[in-house]
């Protein structure tokens, strides 16, 4: 996204020890830690919404965030929260997308980039990318192929969605 004309304003994480903090700081990106510990989800997400609104965030991009969002957050950023999932939804939703795909008889495996709604990996699909499976490959080889697709297509899709949001904003 560095050459896209869009700014990554901040990174919010719910895991204090996440490597993402170090990576963001090295890139000069503002970081925030929001704890869910001994709090209900909506309470934590009120803090997240306050940050997103203060930073004037146009698009929320999830990566490695393994929680369902509450209606409180989803409603405030409807069709402006993206997630990436390491399986071809609607097959294999949830936290085990890669092993579930690997253990299936699916001939095609891949990724889904989608908007977030109230359900688990159930929001409108933005894009899916896939490859034909070789049943002799190990789970590690499949995982590598899936991550390669993620690293190529998530930034491309984020840029495309931001460009569309900019275009809508300019029109009115």
Language-model features and meaning:
Residues 4-6, 14, 63-169:
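Donor/substrate-binding cores of folate-linked one-carbon enzymes
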Residues 9, 58, 79:
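Conserved acidic residues
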Residues 32-37, 84:
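Short beta->alpha connector loops at strand-helix junctions that form conserved
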């Amino acid at each position: 996204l560095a050459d896209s004309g869009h700014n990554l304003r901040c990174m919010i994480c719910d895991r204090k020890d996440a490597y993402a903090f170090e990576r963001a700081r090295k890139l000069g990106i503002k970081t925030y830690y929001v704890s869910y510990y001994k709090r209900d989800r909506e309470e934590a997400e009120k803090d997240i919404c306050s940050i997103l609104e203060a930073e004037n965030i146009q698009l929320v991009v999830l990566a490695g965030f393994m929680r369902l969002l509450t209606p409180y957050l989803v409603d405030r950023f409807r069709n402006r929260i993206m997630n990436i999932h390491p399986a071809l939804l609607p097959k294999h939703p949830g936290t085990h997308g890669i092993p579930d795909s690997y253990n299936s008889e699916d001939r095609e495996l891949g990724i889904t980039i989608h908007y977030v709604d109230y359900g688990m990996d159930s929001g409108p699909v933005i894009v899916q990318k896939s490859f034909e499976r070789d049943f002799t490959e190990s789970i590690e080889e499949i995982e590598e192929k899936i991550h390669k697709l993620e690293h190529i297509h998530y930034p491309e899709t984020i840029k495309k969605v931001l460009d569309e949001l900019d275009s809508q904003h300019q029109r009115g």
